[in-house]
Amino acid sequence: MIATSDLAKEYGARVLFADVSLQLNAGSRYGLVGANGSGKTTFLKVLAGDEEASAGTVTIPKRARVGVLRQDRFLDDAQIILDLAMRGDAVVWSALGEQRRLMEATGEVDAGRLADLEDVIAAHDGYTLEARASEVLEGLAIPTALHRSPLATLSGGFKLRVLLAQVLVGGVDVLLLDEPTNHLDILTIRWLEKFLGGYAGCAVIISHDQRFLDNVTSHTLDVDYGTITLLSGGYSTAMRSSVDLPSPLGPMIATRSPRRTVSDTSVSTRFWP
């Protein structure tokens, strides 16, 4: 699902990571761990295309949809909470919006275009989008009574829950989540664990919550010593199987995995010199 080849990121003389070649697969959830400042968020940004690497490539299937939870993104306070969550499925949201505008327009209706939009909506289970968005919002403890209220109704922490809901509602193939448990209580964390446990795509998750990583992730990516090491198992399993070297989340260094590559003519690859 995501392949990196000889990926590197440097800031001047400082090397965050180099020569990183990984294959991250659908159906797997990867916990991204390491010291503060080690390059976890930078690696996530490179995967998302938000930041350029210094060298190497990132390859993702062209039709794959990617959802990213960023810590530095904010939503419009004037927007309706439910609408913001529904916008997470950009394909359906756009099709529903165009369908509504065509049907409300005066004059002759473009029946062909309406039929095309109907096909798009049906193919993406679009008529359940509102119900799915409501379910995710409720799972994140945003009550139904507030779903049609402006975002400004909520406190800062709950606004971030709406942002998380938007990413989860999208039905994407790849989830890149930077600290998704921030501002969540124990009940909503448990709900998120269950949601991610049933997620069929490829997920890469940054979190300082060890229990959350144990409950959710199937693999661990350790950012340390200028490289990124792929380990089998969640946080605790990876820790037990690793060499006993110091790390802020525990001893997480192991022998680097052999380089893996991917070849697929239907992929989108970003190259850096």
Where do the PLM segments sit?
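Low-acidity, Ser/Thr- and Arg-rich intrinsically disordered low-complexity segments
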Residues: S236, R240-S242, S247, R256-W272
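Residue-level marker of motif borders
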Residues: G31, S247-P248
